[in-house]
């Protein structure tokens, strides 16, 4: 049995479901809070992805949320397949006339191949033991040389953040540990940007799948 085939431990599954439940209750408030225009850091990262993917090629977005990043990528000529595990976000996008499919990257297979994948502000909600399987799954879904844009919270702590809508799992990574996992999955970092967010330090990485 490979890491991709291994079932998710019950504790990990419960932690993820607890986090998703929080987002189910706050999707509209979250959409309003983050705003429809990407932050300067986010816009720069999305442009890096667009530059790495030929116009008209398909990009998979994992954790599309309200869909603002996908909207921005589409203005750059990128075709985006939006996905999210949270029904409230999918419903929000449907009301905007956007199709967002259900995908739980922790347990679901990814159908098809893509020239790019974007997964921003998602990985911090996954347990440490889940990262290898997720990265392996993303690598399999990318064409050789394809681009992966993702972000993670820097540090080495694991904690819960508690809000009015629920509890959110946060797992942070050191740069060295995260890059080692990327390399193990067959990715080579090509661009990065580190910045201080509202509550946590973040790093955004654009990595290429080795041919």
Question: Model-predicted segments: where are they?
Answer:
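Conserved acidic residues
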Residues: 115
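A conserved beta-strand element that flanks and buttresses the S-adenosyl-L-methionine
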Residues: 118
